[in-house]
């Protein structure tokens, strides 16, 4: 299997972005678990796109802190995202299985962080705000 290129990472990230927004905005039967999960996935994939662009190797991980650490050499200002990444990282698995469920407040925070980070990363990557 070949490594995905940057555009593939971004396309997958934007698919997660759209899904997170849709689930968070749903009036009838919103799926806040999915909104949180896809918000985390969007951020994860933008971090991986950044690392791929900078030709920085990275392990298969959903831990945004680990990915952030790999990014800091090239973008030290991303350190300011660490607290929000700690919140988002737990959503990679927390609400995926029985026993825990996201509430509206969780989804609002996750989607807000995702939207802000996506805007910043698109700028860093030289992409249109879209």
Kindly give the residue locations of the regions a language model identified:
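Terminal alpha-helical segments
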Residues: 1-130
